[in-house]
C-alpha cells in the first residue's frame, strides 16, 4: 500500500477559486441525516458560490476564462473549461465490466455496512462513496483503490475482488446486483483493470455527472419530486429521477458507461410509465426509453449542448 494525502473536494476547490465554491464530488464531513446520508455537492443553499452549473451567478467557466490555474483545475474535475471527450479504448467491455464488479461487489458494501445506503458518486478520476462513518471514503481513481479514513489515506492497485474487499475493510458479494447486473464471479480472479479504461471511465463519469447536474435544473413543475445524482452500483451509472409518477411523467435521466445491450457509453431517459414508440425520441429497445449514443456525442460540435438538448426533449415530451 502507498500513502496519499486526504482529499476534501470542496475545500480544494475553494482554495483554488479563492471564494466559496461548489463541486461535483462528495466532501467531508460525514452527513448522518436522512434520507441521503450524503452531502449535495452542487447545492448553493443561498450562498453566492462559484458553481459547476448555471444555477448560480458565477460559474467555473467564468473564473477559468481569466486564470490558467483555475482553468486547469476546473478541467481536471469536470467543473468547467471542459475538454473533448476521448475515444473509447480498444477492448473496452471486459475492463469496464471488472470496474463495475468492484463498484457493486466491494465499494458499495463498505458504505452500506455503515448506514444502510449503497449509492455511489463520481469522484475525481473514477467513482466512490460519499463520506460515511468517521469521515471515511472508499473510491477508485484510475486503477487504484483508495481508502480514506479521516486524515489517513492508503492506496493499492486493484488486483482481485477479494483483495479489494480486504483493503476496503468489507466483504465482496453480489447484494447490490440488479436483474441485469453482470455476475460477480470468482473473487480471486485477476481483474482486467487497465489504465486507459480507468481514465476513460473517470472522464465519462465526470462528463455524465456534470451534464446531469445541469439537467436537474429542468425540474420546474411543483410535483417533479427531484432526486439527486448518484450512481446505482448494480447499473454502474450516474442518474437521477424527476417527474410526477402519478401523472405518468417520472423518468430516470442517466449516463451509462455501457451495458449488456450497449458496448459503448450512452445518455438515456428511461420512463417509469408508458411511452409512445411512434415518437422517434423513444429509440432504445434495450429499455423503456430513449438514448443518445457516444458516437453521436463524439461527432457533435458541442457534446454538452447536445446532451442538454437530449435531456430537455425527454422532459418536454413527458410533460406535454
PLM regions: where:
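Glycine-rich, often proline-containing surface loops adjacent to acidic residues and nearby aromatics
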Residues: 80-81, 87, 144-146, 177-196, ...
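N-terminal ordered "arm"
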Residues: 6-139
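Surface-exposed beta-loop interaction hotspot
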Residues: 164-229
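Amphipathic, interaction-prone secondary-structure segments
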Residues: 115-144, 224-272
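A domain-level signal for the structural core that forms small-molecule/cofactor-binding pockets
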Residues: 2, 124, 152, 277
Amino acid at each position: 500500500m502507498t500513502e496519499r494525502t486526504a482529499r476534501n473536494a470542496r475545500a480544494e476547490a475553494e482554495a483554488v477559486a479563492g471564494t466559496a465554491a461548489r463541486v461535483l464530488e462528495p466532501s467531508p464531513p460525514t452527513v448522518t441525516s436522512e434520507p441521503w446520508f450524503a452531502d449535495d455537492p452542487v447545492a448553493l443553499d443561498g450562498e453566492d458560490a462559484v458553481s459547476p452549473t448555471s444555477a448560480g451567478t458565477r460559474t467555473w467557466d467564468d473564473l477559468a476564462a481569466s486564470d490558467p490555474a483555475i482553468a486547469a483545475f476546473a478541467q481536471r474535475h469536470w467543473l468547467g473549461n471542459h475538454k473533448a471527450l476521448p475515444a473509447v479504448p480498444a477492448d473496452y467491455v471486459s475492463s469496464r465490466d471488472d470496474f463495475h464488479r468492484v463498484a457493486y461487489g466491494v465499494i458499495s458494501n463498505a458504505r452500506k455496512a455503515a448506514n444502510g445506503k449503497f449509492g455511489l458518486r463520481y469522484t475525481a478520476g473514477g467513482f466512490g462513496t460519499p463520506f460515511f462513518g468517521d469521515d471515511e471514503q472508499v473510491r477508485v481513481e484510475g486503477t487504484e483503490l483508495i481508502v480514506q479514513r479521516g486524515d489517513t489515506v492508503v492506496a493499492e492497485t486493484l488486483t482481485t475482488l477479494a483483495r479489494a474487499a480486504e483493503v476496503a475493510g468489507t466483504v465482496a458479494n453480489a447484494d447490490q446486483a440488479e436483474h441485469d447486473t453482470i455476475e460477480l464471479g470468482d473473487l480471486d480472479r485477476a481483474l482486467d483493470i487497465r489504465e486507459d479504461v480507468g481514465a476513460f471511465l473517470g472522464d465519462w463519469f465526470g462528463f455524465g455527472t456534470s451534464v446531469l447536474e445541469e439537467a436537474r435544473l429542468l425540474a420546474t413543475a411543483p410535483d417533479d419530486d427531484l432526486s439527486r445524482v448518484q450512481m446505482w452500483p448494480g447499473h454502474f451509472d450516474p442518474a437521477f429521477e424527476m417527474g410526477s409518477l402519478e401523472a405518468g411523467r417520472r423518468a430516470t435521466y442517466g449516463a451509462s458507461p455501457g451495458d449488456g445491450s450497449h458496448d459503448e457509453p450512452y445518455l438515456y431517459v428511461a420512463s417509469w410509465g408508458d411511452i409512445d414508440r411512434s415518437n422517434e425520441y423513444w429509440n432504445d429497445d434495450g429499455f423503456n426509453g430513449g438514448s443518445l449514443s457516444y458516437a453521436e456525442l463524439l461527432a457533435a460540435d458541442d457534446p454538452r449542448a447536445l446532451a442538454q438538448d437530449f435531456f430537455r426533449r425527454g422532459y418536454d415530451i413527458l410533460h406535454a
